[in-house]
């Protein structure tokens, strides 16, 4: 199922300035619940929800998505799916680093309908890859929620959008798997006059990480 929009429950600025954010982001689950309770006071919209709720999570570190998913489950008829884990780290926080990040997931995802949960939506590649993982295991992802986001909440691209991107960059499939690209990634790509400029910027970013 194609998801056009991500739903945002609060905002990034408020989240990162919470007194609970640092410890929650570093892996303290109690702090993560305190953060969620501070930022989201009404879960009534989820009352009739009956599906799996799967957070973006690693085996250590940031517990905010897990806490948000847990609160949604507590206030609905949904079931928490906490058996899927992100296995690799993003190479950096710059947009260029996010462009070439390929998230890898592992774990058990029961067959059924899902909503996905993350703390912040930036490019959407982490959520997109989680969606792909769940769907490859027979699940059906119907929606996604985050606390905060970047400028856009648009998520998956239309066939027309992908066709226009390929017309702009005929060799783009040498660099990216088009169906995996999100709207935010596509809009970033369209800023470049050529793919070689994009690749050069990425190479420079990786060089700086290695030597500075």
Where are these regions (language model features)?
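Short glycine-rich phosphate-binding loop at a beta-alpha junction
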Residues: 46-60
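Active-site-facing substrate-recognition patch
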Residues: 1-48, 89-108, 183-191, 200
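A contiguous pocket-lining binding segment that forms or flanks enzyme active sites
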Residues: 112-136
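Short, highly selective alpha-helical patches that border small-molecule cofactor pockets
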Residues: 61, 65-73, 127
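Structural alpha-beta junctions
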Residues: 73-82, 135-142
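PRPP-dependent phosphoribosyltransferase catalytic core
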Residues: 5-8, 131-212
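A short, structured active-site edge motif that brings together acidic residues
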Residues: 80-91
């Amino acid at each position: 199922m194609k998801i056009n929009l991500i739903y945002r429950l609060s905002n990034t600025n408020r989240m990162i300035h919470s007194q609970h954010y640092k410890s929650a982001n570093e892996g303290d689950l109690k702090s993560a619940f305190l953060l969620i309770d501070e930022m989201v006071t009404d879960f009534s919209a989820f009352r009739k929800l009956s599906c799996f709720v799967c957070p973006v999570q690693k085996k250590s570190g940031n517990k905010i998505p897990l806490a948000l998913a847990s609160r949604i489950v507590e206030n609905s008829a949904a079931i928490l799916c906490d058996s899927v884990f992100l296995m690799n780290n993003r190479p950096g926080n710059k947009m260029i680093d996010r462009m070439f990040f390929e998230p890898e997931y592992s774990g058990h995802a029961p067959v059924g309908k899902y909503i996905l949960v993350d703390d912040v939506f930036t490019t959407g590649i982490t959520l997109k890859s989680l969606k792909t993982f769940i769907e490859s295991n027979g699940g059906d992802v119907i929606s996604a929620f985050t606390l905060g986001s970047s400028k856009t909440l648009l998520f998956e691209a239309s066939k027309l959008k992908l066709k226009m991107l390929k017309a702009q960059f005929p060799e783009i499939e040498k660099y990216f798997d088009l169906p995996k690209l999100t709207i935010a990634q596509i809009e970033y790509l369209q800023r470049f006059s050529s793919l070689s400029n994009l690749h050069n910027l990425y190479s420079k970013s990786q060089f700086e990480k290695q030597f500075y």
